[in-house]
Amino acid sequence: MGTGMGTGTGVRTEMGAGMDTPPELAVDRLLDDPGTRIIVCCGAGGVGKTTTAAALGLRAAERGRKVVVLTIDPARRLAQSMGIDSLDNTPRKVAGVAGGGELHAMMLDMKRTFDEIVESHADGERAAAILANPFYQSLSAGFAGTQEYMAMEKLGQLRARDDWDLIVVDTPPSRSALDFLDAPKRLGSFLDGKFIRVLMAPAKVGGRAGMKFLNVGMSLMTGTLNKLMGASLLGDVQTFVAAMDTMFGGFRTRADATFRLLQAPGTAFLVVAAPEPDALREAAYFVERLGAERMPLAGLVLNRVHGSGAAQLSAERALAAAENLEEGGIVDQEAGKAGLGAPAAHSPAGGSAPESEGVEAGAYTDAPEGADVEGITAGLLRLHAERMQLIAREQRTRDRFTSLHPDVAVTEVAALPGDVHDLAGLRTIGERLAAGVPAGA
């Protein structure tokens, strides 16, 4: 299956010797390529898209590029990590960026962006009438698809200004990642569609003839709407439509233009996911959709991947050792399932586990008098077993994705112990993005 992978960014490497190992996503090569003008981070909600976008922007800036990051509803801590108390619809320069580049950040204000469209396409009197209209205020503040449409609109505005050589976009959180591609077209079609044209007709006919047309042609619909939303709704809608008459044709045109911009060679999509079934299922859908729309997919960023410094000790052996300790038994080094000796406190003649088995020699010799060394050790072994089981589940989930999409380049980002709260944390994420290894390697 095609993935829409662009060839101009040079982000893919050759497949490894094992066919199950996907190509590695060369993040720095992508960021350094002057032909890369837009990076879109997309995927399901709650997988670290916003942090990934900010980390990519910082890394690109510190490698010499002039970057703006367009975020959608970021956590306050993330804004503060960039040294900004609050983000708004205006790009703000981030202080403390090393290297020769610049980093600017902004947060989409969908209502303000909609207001800007009105103000730029209508004269002062008409713009004021539109902005004060109750139906417009509801539409601009939360109509289905408005946030996605305005994200596309703002992206088009930033690209047209040409003040930055790289724009990193964090797509809106939504029930489905596909909404980012679908919702702008839906809203544009609504605003340019038959429903609006029907509402325009009475205003264009005018006077009693217009009201007669409205009463005959729309009585059922308006009756239902009035029951649901109040008798004043129709008047607000008609006033809105009359004021917006000269603007409606542009909504779908601008949405289509931005959609074509997303298909252009200078754009790169990064699908962001976590090693969880739902997130990777959504990522797989998005990969397929990008291929169908012929959009340039750079690869998959797999966040919050867990590992272990004692991976040579399997979950099964750790559990077996824990059970023996809890039962008060002594594990035989030659025949025991766990392959671990008894704790040093009870076996001074060499019962300590060798370091190669993941337990340091003499680990128990400094235990406080009266401490339940066996119980503590058994608990730690069970925690290790749970971690190894989690790692195995994540690996199986990754393997399912890579078996379906073996040509999609992958980088993995190890899970962090806490939240990112400063530029140093974003740098760490950027370093892990650039140094990540393919799943299964």
Residue ranges and their predicted role:
Residues 1-5, 9-33, 222, 226-242, ...:
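C-terminal lobe/tail of nucleotide-utilizing enzymes
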Residues 2-3, 16-39, 47, 52, ...:
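Nucleotide-state-sensitive switch-loop elements of NTP-binding domains
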Residues 44:
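P-loop (Walker A) phosphate-binding loop of NTP-binding proteins
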